[in-house]
Amino acid sequence: MNSGMGIILTIAAQGLLVIAFVMISLLFLVYGDRKIWAAVQLRRGPNVVGAFGLLQTVADAAKYIFKEVVVPAGVDRPVFFLAPLISFVLAVLAWAVIPFSPGWVLSDINVAILFVFAASSLEVYGVIMGGWASNSKYPFLGSLRSAAQMISYEVSLGLIIIGIIISTGSMNLSHIVEAQDGAFGLFNWYWLPHLPMVALFFISALAETNRPPFDLPEAESELVAGFQVEYSSTPFLLFMAGEYIAIFLMCALMSLLFFGGWLSPIPGLPDGVFWMVAKMAFFFFLFAMVKAIVPRYRYDQLMRIGWKVFLPFSLGWVVLVAFLAKFEVFGGFWARWAMGG
């Protein structure tokens, strides 16, 4: 009995550490996003609350929490309040299987990629529920856009990940990182043999997380604020937090799948969690820069790219990877390169 309680307490403590990391990272993500956007527009950004404005995000969070929760007439109250909670919880849940270093993972399961993909796919239900429960046409249109958009690009993301699974022979994220270890540092990582898929994964991640230039579910110029129109205070904060956590999750997946996770890019330097966090921060910087400099796509353009460009290309890449790996084309060179064989 004591042993079982000890295991439960250990898991609970590890879970709290993961949640603490995600929530602390969230503060810096919002701050960094605003600072980068301000720098591109030749503004100063947050600079009043705390040193260099570092506590501005804390002040904004406190403001949201203590504001009145305004509930419009005619909404479905249980679903209205459940929707942001679903989006937030599912975004945090996926971090349970993200490894930061050998042994630094809450649950090192052999179907980690499938778990992350399932959790991120279910987030769309929070958006749909929020749009439908608001009893307003603008949130409902935004939620429908979100559903179509996420379904369209999840297919491409899944096919891209299948190529990595074929190369590794495992869906365990730790095994995928270990398969990229080698004497040539960053040239052993999967970004090189899977180079076309790196760009596709990055763009699909933007669309999957409703990030500019694909933020059509909350297009201010068309739908006011999309599915978030009727939300205020803490429910709105949960939606926003879930979005940023999902973005950071995509940064972690890019680091693990293509860029060696915690592996050092330079042979001889020690591996560790520092490299993992640094890579995630770099990819978030790219996300923020795209938001600041790329104009929003039209909805028909977004759907056309997803179904007529990304889907055929990613499907063809899976077939090519499987063919090269199975039949040892080029004397098995590609298989040895991508699989460490």
UniProtKB/Swiss-Prot annotation:
Subcellular location: Cell inner membrane
Membrane topology: Multi-pass membrane protein
Catalysis performed (reactions): a quinone + NADH + 5 H(+)(in) = a quinol + NAD(+) + 4 H(+)(out)
Top-level division of the source organism's lineage: Bacteria
An annotated GO BP: aerobic respiration
Annotated keywords: Cell inner membrane, Cell membrane, Membrane, NAD, Quinone, Translocase, Transmembrane, Transmembrane helix, Ubiquinone
Broad class of where this protein is predominantly found: membrane
Residues that span the membrane, as ranges: 7-27, 46-66, 80-100, 111-131, 157-177, 183-203, 244-264, 273-293, 305-325
GO cellular component terms listed in the entry, alphabetical order: plasma membrane
InterPro entries membership: NADH_UbQ_OxRdtase_su1/FPO, NADH_UbQ_OxRdtase_su1_CS
Pfam families to which the protein is assigned, alphabetical: NADHdh (PF00146)
EC class name: translocase
EC nos: 7.1.1.-
Keyword Cell membrane assigned: yes
PANTHER family: NADH DEHYDROGENASE SUBUNIT 1, NADH-UBIQUINONE OXIDOREDUCTASE CHAIN 1
Subunit structure: NDH-1 is composed of 14 different subunits. Subunits NuoA, H, J, K, L, M, N constitute the membrane sector of the complex.
Protein role: NDH-1 shuttles electrons from NADH, via FMN and iron-sulfur (Fe-S) centers, to quinones in the respiratory chain. The immediate electron acceptor for the enzyme in this species is believed to be ubiquinone. Couples the redox reaction to proton translocation (for every two electrons transferred, four hydrogen ions are translocated across the cytoplasmic membrane), and thus conserves the redox energy in a proton gradient. This subunit may bind ubiquinone.
Family of the protein in this entry: Belongs to the complex I subunit 1 family.
Entry protein name: NADH-quinone oxidoreductase subunit H 1
Annotated gene: nuoH1
